[in-house]
Amino acid sequence: MAIPLKKFAEQCEEVAIANGKITPLSSPSVSLHDISREWRKLCNATPYKSLNLPNWSEKEEGAAEVIIAALTYLQRIGCKDIEKLLWANLELHRRQTL
């Protein structure tokens, strides 16, 4: 099930607004703080089964939360092409390695 990251980021933002994490007028820095919060949770996650998502470990769930928070942030700052940004960043790392 492939979904364009831009569309997924829009859905992440909608859910964040619906559950009260942000409002339509919130500064993008609120989403940036959420990345930090989710990252700290991931650092404490275990490899054991998640209580929220029983088919996944706490570490997998935590990593997904960090990604969702990051996509929400990119959406909030108006990133137009998330896929291109990620590919460009990966290519930068590849060039720096070679």
Regions found by a protein language model. Name each.
Residues 1-98:
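Flexible "arm" and connector segments at domain edges
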